[in-house]
Amino acid sequence: MNLVLASTSPRRKELLTHIGLGRAEFRFTQVAPDIDETPKAGELPRDYVQRLAAEKALAGLALCSGMSQPAVLGSDTIVVLENEILGKPVDEADAKRVLRALSGKAHTVMTAVALAKADQTSVRLVETLVRFCVLSDADIDAYVASQEPMDKAGSYGIQGLGGCFVESIEGSYSCVVGLPLVETRELLSEAGIR
């Protein structure tokens, strides 16, 4: 079976590499699926993130038509505060708005991971509770000026500079980064990929 990561995210690539535990035989390729990420009317956050992960995996599978036995991994991460999905910021002002909203509060990070093969698609959802410390305007301005939050759900990266805002987490750290390792390993193992 040929493993394919349906993502160009460097964070997901690095995390998936960890699953191989350094074994030379654990290899994968990457494709860049293009899907519409617009939430459907009335769609709950957990349904939305699972749908996107599955759609990314299936779109990736469609890009692998010439490959022998592809198994395509798709993933999506969202940040949810008070039942509102906080996606990637559209600009610096939006990033600042989101960071102000997260300041001093707990929010949920949801990451869904899907594995699509010719005959089936399996999805896992992982939720992690993240609590932010209180952020000053100077903290927010400096962080946004670093440009780190501009391509991240919820306008922060726990694995980078944004990690200094995280007071605590309850759940999977790798979920917050963008690919829950335990659940991804389970999906791969169930598919016979080790």
Curated annotation (Swiss-Prot):
Listed cofactors: a divalent metal cation
InterPro entries per UniProt: ITPase-like_fam, Maf-like
Catalytic activity: dTTP + H2O = dTMP + diphosphate + H(+); UTP + H2O = UMP + diphosphate + H(+)
Site (Important for substrate specificity): 11, 77, 159
Main localization, broad class: cytoplasm
Active site, UniProt feature: 76 (proton acceptor)
Alphabetized Gene3D superfamilies for the sequence: 3.90.950.10
Alphabetized UniProt keyword annotations: Cytoplasm, Hydrolase, Nucleotide metabolism
Primary enzyme class: hydrolase
Cellular localization per UniProt: Cytoplasm
Pfam name, any one: Maf
GO biological process: nucleotide metabolic process
Function: Nucleoside triphosphate pyrophosphatase that hydrolyzes dTTP and UTP. May have a dual role in cell division arrest and in preventing the incorporation of modified nucleotides into cellular nucleic acids.
Similarity comment text for this entry: Belongs to the Maf family. YhdE subfamily.
Cited NCBIfam families: maf
Protein name from the UniProt record: dTTP/UTP pyrophosphatase
Record organism: Shewanella sp. (strain MR-4)
Classification of source organism: Bacteria, Pseudomonadati, Pseudomonadota, Gammaproteobacteria, Alteromonadales
